[in-house]
């Protein structure tokens, strides 16, 4: 139903409700304090107790049929089931930690029941980033490979980039020139041998040493110049094409990274950083190898084979050309078939490599959790299991490589022997000279080097295509949150926020909101409260367009947020999240991240308002102090103050505080909230507070109580207390715990939780 909200003056009706610290935090029950134990910790406790009953410690990490596939996925699933505001279940179905994953898992686009109506759910088992989710036929794989090459050609031969095209043409010209010079080398050998070997029938007087020196010396000089010229052309080609290759890699990597940043929050919550970054790294290296192999190996080798076959057919007869052609065909067939057989071993090795990478990164990022539960041996065992799989796959790769090399050598040696026999027979019959035999030998041996490289190149080319397929598939992941083309910017006049009949759920079978409607008045402080899992944090995620509702509309100052540009929408909204994201940089940079063009004076002003200057005074390096990976070198309260400073520096029109002071002591919290309120009063900004500790929001102009997918009640603190509804129950529970009524309060909280669970049960 629609909820009408009247405009309220910017003042509390009761001074006692404006006092921060009215109730001591140690008197609040743990169930009301959400940060007393995090969702991850609860999941870890459950997982820890379950895991102690298992006889196989690799059950979750290494069993393909495992329900969760990795401890991180288990934590995410448990957190989502408990809170209702985390990872969509349909997007957490496959992560690279499971044994069935080969590279990294993509988030399937959400189903209609849990995402935008425009989205379609990916069929199970057809994950675009899991290359082994369904075995492709040879024809399908060829189509995929050609599609990758065509896509790459767009970067090598870009429209409108005349300079890059010039470099490509010049590189090809140098390639042809180098091969023409390279083919001349055996002819100079033939000339040298024939002139020195046939003194009697030579057209010149070869009995004269000076003549011999001139003829032989000229041939040797030509031989040397041909080799030097071929090498010079090759190196020039490398230098010219290097710019093309590196620029293509840069463009592809930038395109993939841009697409990753455009993906929705749900997709990123189901990723494991180690596997994702490893896949991108291998993909960019694959581009480099593919370009160099095509330009420097495959095309040159094909050109050289064609020229050699033509020369042998013209100079020595069709039998030599036929042997050469048959050899090349047999060599290529054997290499391709064997390499295709070996590809699955490389995929298995890559999968194990990814599992090892994700396991190590996951363990190191969650170092404290590992220590808290004494699970070092468990993490080491998981890592060792992945390394053991990699070891087995690598052994298969090495042994199959030996078989491939042996077969290639047998084919080439047989061909060389046959051609030498034919040449020797020609010399005996007088149809060929000794120089012709040397020329044939040199021509065939000259093919041996590129052929040997061709085998290696094809093997690596196949692997590069696999890696590039993984990386390019990242770009094929659907962007769940899209903006209209030429969408106008959001124009904020006051900051009124209105939800109209919004329905949304992270899980298809568990909606968080059911046709919820409410209005947040412009320029006032509004608070959202309610039991855990009622969707308080979800309001911000929908407002920020991290997710799209299944139905309903959201407006800011009368403008549908789906019709305005994402950049302007997110520029006008600022948030202090529960878990503060910090970069591994100094304090100044982390504050300035709120507005990158801010001056040092602006940064320090925001720091003072957020009480960060109190931290800086005690640090030897001041604002240049590094905060460490994810800010782990500073306390939780200090991280929250940095987040508040960053928000104040951004100076958005709408401010969202999600348990923004839960890690602060009462004194610091009081001072910080006083500064925040002063800012809100001065600028008349719309502020939304989410809190479990009701004393921190009791002075709000308006309080909205959520339960069961909708608005349970709303009003000022006094109005809600007078009505003695859910808000009154929560307030009484927090006020009485620790003063002799703990048992009764706990029973009351259990009743509230039962009501919440029953109200969110799918209907």
UniProtKB/Swiss-Prot annotation:
Subcellular location(s) of the protein: Mitochondrion inner membrane
Membrane topology: Multi-pass membrane protein
Record carries keyword GTP-binding: no
Domain of life: Eukaryota
Record EC number: 7.-.-.-
Enzyme class: translocase
Region (Disordered): 107-133
Stretches in topological domain Mitochondrial intermembrane: 190-217, 315, 422-436
A GO MF term: ATPase-coupled transmembrane transporter activity
Residues holding ATP: 506, 530-541
Subunit (UniProt): Homodimer.
Protein name: Iron-sulfur clusters transporter ATM1, mitochondrial
Native organism: Mycosarcoma maydis (Corn smut fungus)
